[in-house]
Curated annotation (Swiss-Prot):
Membrane topology: Multi-pass membrane protein
Superkingdom assignment: Bacteria
PTS EIIB type-1 domain: residues covered: 1-89
InterPro entries reported in the protein's UniProt record: Glu_permease_IIB, PTrfase_EIIB_Cys, PTS_EIIC, PTS_EIIC_1, PTS_IIB_1, PTS_Sugar-Specific_Components
Residues passing through the membrane, by range: 118-138, 160-180, 186-206, 220-240, 265-285, 304-324, 337-357, 371-391, 396-416, 443-463
Protein name: PTS system N-acetylmuramic acid-specific EIIBC component
Function: The phosphoenolpyruvate-dependent sugar phosphotransferase system (sugar PTS), a major carbohydrate active transport system, catalyzes the phosphorylation of incoming sugar substrates concomitantly with their translocation across the cell membrane. This system is involved in N-acetylmuramic acid (MurNAc) transport, yielding cytoplasmic MurNAc-6-P. Is also able to take up anhydro-N-acetylmuramic acid (anhMurNAc), but cannot phosphorylate the carbon 6, probably because of the 1,6-anhydro ring.
PANTHER family on file: PHOSPHOTRANSFERASE SYSTEM TRANSPORT PROTEIN (PTHR30175), PTS SYSTEM N-ACETYLMURAMIC ACID-SPECIFIC EIIBC COMPONENT (PTHR30175:SF3)
Domain PTS EIIC type-1: 116-476
GO MF assignments: kinase activity; protein-N(PI)-phosphohistidine-sugar phosphotransferase activity; protein-phosphocysteine-N-acetylmuramate phosphotransferase system transporter activity
EC number: 2.7.1.192
Top EC class, one word: transferase
């Protein structure tokens, strides 16, 4: 298994065009994201040959190197240290060339770029989703096993369960504010303005209500205020608010920017939110909930969703499903779509295992799979996608078939009257998702359904790859 060391970082910098060509370095869970002055001087073929690089992806103005979980963070830190103060300012010619590349990219892939921004909104929240979801899952298991139906349950256990659940309640009570903050920043506005606009969807507008925080407004100049629309409305308000803020800033003198830009932006966007975004958000939210609720209850629909999910990951638009997750949690009480889509990763694992057994002992492919299979079991599929199945095409297709089979299984069980889903908006997939499963019938039936779908996806991905996707495929 490749390690991140100084020699590897030196090779990466060399084939990225040298230190002077690197503008900035960031990372996510599995990718090293490098912003370059000139992407034309990058040697992508040599980058792919470096031990430990599982794939190279071009997205927006970034070059993304797939390294795997944990390794991306270490590589980013080491590369920043190596670059030091050598990340030079670009020349006028370089600026012009970069602007031209960005404009061309915007003309050809604006939809992809829009969905890519969702990653910057939701990715920072994922650890919190996972932590709160795991605690809620464990608390639910303890409650059903030792408290439900017990005449005199242990007082300490009751308090412990309540304590473990409080984090999930806190997360969901104020999650809209976090999303509003991140969304505004992602689209070029001030995060705090996005958070304030998001709070309009949380506040109450009924002075007689006994729950929530009363806003002090019972109507908007005589018009009824309906703060429904949930995350859809929050996203629209924050994104439009960022655009309005940038427009307002053009007319505000620099000396008054701090005092007036946000003031004017909030006045405009508050009115726009109450009059248009909230009503529209309700219809969009309800329509999205209806569509995916019906797809989830249809085994053919779940098969299609699971089968196509790897393609959405490959295109970088899979973050677009996150608003749907919120809609499902709001309407159903759990995220029924997430475990269906997680079957795509299970199909990928099955396909990779088939390639491992088909490859000869000592083959480089076997070493690649060894390094990526454990993260694959734990729900991190990018190393397998970009390093193993996608470059060989046929195994990628059979991995999608495996995911479709797992999705069909979960959809069929839901169709028979036993729906299930994730107990939080977002969480880990793979085997790590097991304790987060829930259903109206209890936690254990939900876990059993998820495991059955996963096994079916593993098996289908393995069998279809082993028998139909290795001929004329590079197994070296």
């Amino acid at each position: 298994m490749a390690t991140i060391d100084n020699a590897m970082i030196h090779s990466l910098i060399q084939h990225l065009g040298g230190k002077s060509n690197i503008q900035s370095v960031t990372n996510c869970m599995t990718r090293l994201r490098v912003t370059l002055h000139d992407s034309s001087v990058v040697d992508k073929d040599e980058l792919k040959k470096i031990q430990g690089v599982l794939g190279v992806v071009e997205a927006d103005e970034q070059l993304q190197l797939i390294l795997g979980p944990g390794k991306a963070t270490k590589a980013a830190e080491m590369m920043k240290a190596s670059l030091g103060d050598n990340m030079s300012s670009p020349s006028l010619q370089e600026i012009a060339r970069t602007q031209k590349q960005q404009i061309k990219s915007a003309q050809t892939s604006s939809i992809h770029q829009f969905f890519a921004k969702f990653a910057t909104i939701f990715t920072p929240l994922i650890p919190g989703f996972i932590g709160a979801g795991l605690l809620l899952g464990l608390a639910t298991v303890l409650q059903q096993a030792f408290v439900a139906g017990v005449e005199n349950p242990n007082a300490f256990l009751v308090d412990l369960i309540a304590y473990m659940k409080v984090f999930s309640k806190g997360l969901f009570s104020f999650l809209s504010i976090l999303i509003g903050y991140n969304a505004a920043k992602a689209f070029g506005g001030s995060g705090v303005n996005g958070a304030i606009l998001a709070s309009l969807f949380i506040l109450g507008y009924n002075p007689e209500a006994t729950k929530g925080i009363y806003s002090g407004l019972s109507n908007f100049f005589g018009l009824t205020i309906d703060p429904r629309g949930n995350i859809i409305g929050v996203l629209i308000a924050a994104i439009v608010g960022a655009k309005v803020e940038r427009w307002v800033r053009k007319f505000i003198p620099d000396s008054l920017d701090m005092a007036l830009t946000s003031t004017v932006t909030l006045l405009i966007m508050g009115c726009f939110t109450f009059l248009f975004i909230m009503p529209i958000g309700v219809y969009l939210f309800n329509g999205m909930s209806w569509l995916f609720s019906n797809l989830n209850g249809n085994p053919l629909g779940t098969a299609v969703l699971a089968g196509l999910f790897l393609i959405s990951v490959m295109l970088g638009i899979h973050q677009g499903f996150v608003p749907v997750y919120f809609a499902l949690v709001e309407t159903q009480g759990f995220n029924a779509l997430f475990p269906v889509l997680a079957m795509a990763g299970a199909g990928q694992v099955g396909a990779a295992l088939a390639l491992y057994f088909k490859a000869n002992k000592g083959a480089v492919l076997r070493d690649q799979i060894k390094g990526a299979i454990i993260p694959g079991f734990l729900g991190i599929g990018e190393p397998l996608i970009y390093g193993v199945t996608l470059p060989r095409v046929k195994p990628f297709i059979t991995a999608c078939i495996g995911g479709a089979a797992g999705g069909f299984t979960i959809g069929l069980i839901a169709y028979l009257g036993f729906p299930m889903g994730l107990n939080t908006v977002f969480g880990p997939s793979g085997l790590l998702a097991i304790p987060l499963m829930t259903s109206p019938n209890g936690v254990l039936p939900a876990i059993a359904t998820y495991l059955l779908g996963t096994v079916v996806a593993y098996a289908t991905g393995f069998i279809t790859t082993y028998f139909f996707a290795t001929k004329d495929v590079d197994l070296s």
